[in-house]
Amino acid sequence: MAQKDHPNGPKKSASASSKRWMYEHVNDFYVKEATKKGLRSRAVFKLEEINKKDKLIRSGMTVVDLGAAPGSWSQWAVDTVGLKGKVIACDILPMDSIAGVDFLQGDFREDAVVNALLARIAGHKVDVVLSDMSPNMTGTVGIDQPKSMYLVELALEMCKEVLVKEGSFVVKVFMGSEFDLFMSEARKCFKSVKTRKPDSSRSRSREVYVVATGYKG
């Protein structure tokens, strides 16, 4: 449920920074690789690298993917869990269907959407919760970081509802004033909590991925 790239988000005139971003994007190695492999975005390589290091997602698992659009994480996850596994995805934005992925469109900040997602899970526990959610960015850290942390905290609350004991959680976090507090909260719930900065994450970006394993239940 990527609050990212929302069609109603703030519109900015073409600036030097946006032109630089576009130049880097079209010349980006990971963008080219994703296009060549028929994947929906370069973000897939972040999850692939994290999973290679931490071995979180395996055949037969059930995975919840929050902030799923345009779908590259769900694509990768459903291929990895195979026919005996399950992927349930959610995003505020529409997402083209992916075979084997149960997709719910809605705003994860709304109780009705969370309840609908829980209904899709149908009382079963899941092995991994993924969250690549991000708010519409204004460029003002004092606004963007709290909005981002709110989504991170909602994803952690979802873990408490649905994760199997010893389950795992991967969440995108933007470094800022509330980061240490979130890490402290995550450590109360998981045996191991670490940060990852995948090679495919742009170096200028303040994003990191928190990888939490061994859910205490």
UniProtKB/Swiss-Prot annotation:
E.C. number(s) listed in UniProt: 2.1.1.166
Positions of the catalytic residues: 172 (proton acceptor)
Location within or outside the cell: Cytoplasm
Record keywords, A-Z: Cytoplasm, Methyltransferase, rRNA processing, S-adenosyl-L-methionine, Transferase
Ligand binding (S-adenosyl-L-methionine): 71, 73, 91, 107, 132
GO cellular component, one term: cytoplasm
Methyltransferase as UniProt keyword: yes
Main subcellular location: cytoplasm
Role of this protein: Specifically methylates the uridine in position 2552 of 23S rRNA at the 2'-O position of the ribose in the fully assembled 50S ribosomal subunit.
HAMAP family referenced in this protein's UniProt entry, alphabetically: RNA_methyltr_E
UniProt record similarity statement: Belongs to the class I-like SAM-binding methyltransferase superfamily. RNA methyltransferase RlmE family.
Name of the featured protein: Ribosomal RNA large subunit methyltransferase E
Protein's organism: Psychromonas ingrahamii (strain DSM 17664 / CCUG 51855 / 37)
